[in-house]
Amino acid sequence: MPLYDYGNTRLRARISKLFSFPTLESFAYLTSLDSLISQLSKTHYQDAIQIALTYAHGYGCISDALRRKLIEIQDNLRRFYDPVIWEKIKTIFLREDVKNIKSIIRGIIHKTQPRIIINSLSPLGVIPEQYTTRIAQAKNIQDAIDRMSVYQLEFAPSLLALKGSDRFASSAELERVLEFWYFSKIEQILKGSGENIDLLRKANMIEIDITNINTLLRYVDAPDSPETAGSTIEHFLIEGGSYSPKYLINLSHTNLISDVIKKLAGKKYQSYLMEALNCYQETQLLSEFENQLRIYALRWLSLLPKLSPFGVGVPMGYVALKKSEIRNIRWIAKGILSGFEPKFIIENIERIQ
């Protein structure tokens, strides 16, 4: 696939420079953030660290450098690939936009300080950062959606259509509209056939599954939640995943999370859901399931550069691997800052290969 040759060659070189797990584990034994900064400055993080050091130190320096490396991911892919190819690859980053807007909506509804909302946003989205910053500073949801409309964001009309309805101020309903817009948009982009389209569709199916499973678990855990009151689960389910909406609707009548997981676990996510269930039984946090499903998706993506070395699998895998590396460095930095034992830091390093 000639259109992918140049970009894939460049990305394979970058994949070869990613930190091995023994290297990440060695960082956990460092006794200070200054030592970690020193070590990172001798690696492919050198430029980002040097820039960050001009106006930050300690964790602030590391956080700024990691943010720069995240932004660099999309910048590189734009440069390395033909615009036609980029339109397909861009679907990876559109998901980040949806997550960012959902975070903004939740933050505004719960009256979170704009600074905190802005700091939680991923720089990997396609929407310009100055737009998301301005939206996060809105005084209320109405103002936020008006700003989305002014910036001509594609999903703004769908959100504006809710104005005047009883569900307008509902985070769950606004997020539902965003999810439906996103998956409809991806379906339009991924029309056609071929190996590359098939890979992107499989990735999209995993996202649908994760969205639907999380929706199902929230319903079972809190069927009378104010966020979902007055709506059936069918209202929130996305078509096109591994599980039919009918099957998920039937499961929503199950009383216990553990029973739902055991019925879901016969599919490809079995070991991940069961691992999450073990953790959930200790913590009672539904985020255990979301995290394990995210790990499944990252591991699937991380294999693509080897399984599909001549097409879109390389950029898909590279993005997953780089995001995971950055997440691990951030965790190690926080662990050192908090004074955690090296063993504990190492045990919680994300391993997707």
Regions found by a protein language model. Give the residues of each.
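N-terminal domain-start signal
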Residues: 1-353
